[in-house]
Amino acid sequence: MKELSANTGDKEVHDIDKLDSGITAHGILEVMQDGYGFIRSANYLPGENDVYVSPSQIRRFNLKTGDILEGNTRIKTQQEKFSALLYLSKINEMDPMKAMHRKNFEDMTPIFPNERLSLECGKTSTAMRIMDLMSPIGKGQRGMIVSPPKAGKTTLLKQVALSVQKNNPEVHLLILLIDERPEEVTDIRESIEGPNVEVIYSTFDELPEHHKRVSEMVIERAKRLVEHKKDVMILIDSITRLARAYNLTVPPSGRTLSGGLDPAALHMPKRFFGAARNMREGGSLTILATALVDTGSKMDDVVYEEFKGTGNMELVLDRKLSEKRMFPAIDIPKSSTRREDLLLNKDEQEAVEIMRRALNGMRAEEAVESILNMFSNTKNNNCLLY
C-alpha cells in the first residue's frame, strides 16, 4: 500500500522508504471531530504511544472510529509529539482496497435472531442449560440480565462468555466492564482468554468521561466488525452504571426524571443497546447487558424501566433465591425470549411449554427447586427432552 500513502503527497515510493521508521503501528482508530485520527493501543484509550493518522488517509480509505489498523510509521522528528502513520498495510486484518468498499452498519437490514448460540457445553453449569431452554440466545439478540446486587450476575456473565467461546469460536467476544471492581476485572481477564476475546474495562475509580469514552469505542469497534459480516457479542456489566456515567457527563437539559436522572442521559445508552441486531446481509451484533434493580436507588429503577421494553430477551435473577443460597438464582417464570420459536426446535418448544405450564402458579423458590432437580437428574438437555 506504499503507493497509496496519503501522508507523503506526490513523492515516489523510494522516498517513502527513506521516511519509513521500520516500526509497525497496530491498534484501534479514533477519529476526532477535526477530521484527523489516532491509533490507540492499550484499553482503547489515549496514551503516549498513539500514532497520528492524517485526514487525507481517513478520507481515502473510508476509515471510521473502531477500525483496527496496521501500518508503518514515519521517522519522528524532535518537534513531533506523536509518530505519524506513513502507509497502511491492513484494515481490520483485510487488504485496505477490499475493506474500503464495505456497507455502512446503518444501511444493513435488521431481522429477528434465527441462529442459536448454544450455551450448553459438556459438564456445564445448570444455569447455562436453563438459559438454553427457557431463554435461548440467538445471534443478534438484545438481551438483558435483570439482577439485584449479590445475585450472581457477574458469574453468570462469565459463564456465558466461556460457553460462547467454547461452542461458537467464530463469534468475536467483547466484554465491557463499566464501573466494576478492579479484582473482578482481573478475574475476568485471566479466566476468559483467546484470539477472539477482548476485555475492555473502566473501573469505579475512573471518571465518568472515561466510562463514556470506553463504551463508545467498544460499540464502534463492534459495528466495524459487523460491517465485515462477522458475528460479534458484547457482554456489558452494567448498562445501569453506564447510564449513571452519562447522567454526570451530558449537559443538563433542564428536565429531570425521578431519582435525579436527566432524560438526555438515556439517549446514548439506548443507542448502545439498540445497536444489537441480526443482519440479513450477513453478520450479527449480540448484546447481553446486566441491569441493576432493588439497589435502594430510585435512579436505577428508572433506568431499568426505560430499558424494559427495548430488549428481546430477559433473564431475571431473584434476590430471595440467592439469599437462600440457591444458585443459579433465576426467576424462571419471569425469564423469556421473544420469538423463541425461531431458535428452538419442535421438541424443545413442547418441553418448554410443558415446564412453563407446570411452573404456573408455583412460588419462585418452588419453581427453581423443581427445575434444578429436573436438570441435576439428567446429564444434558437432550436427556431431559427424550
Task: Give the ranges of each region predicted by the language model.
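N-terminal "pre-motor" subdomain/linker immediately upstream of P-loop NTPase catalytic cores
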Residues: E3-A99
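P-loop NTPase catalytic core
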Residues: G152, V160-V164, N168-P169, L173-P195, ...
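Phosphate-interacting basic helix/loop segments used at nucleotide- and nucleic-acid interfaces
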Residues: D17-A25, T126-I130, V218-K223, F272
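Short flexible coil/turn linkers enriched for glycine and charged/polar residues
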Residues: S21-I23, V31-G35, L45-G47, L63-D67, ...
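ATP-binding Walker
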Residues: K139, A151-G152
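P-loop NTP-binding catalytic core
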Residues: I75-I145
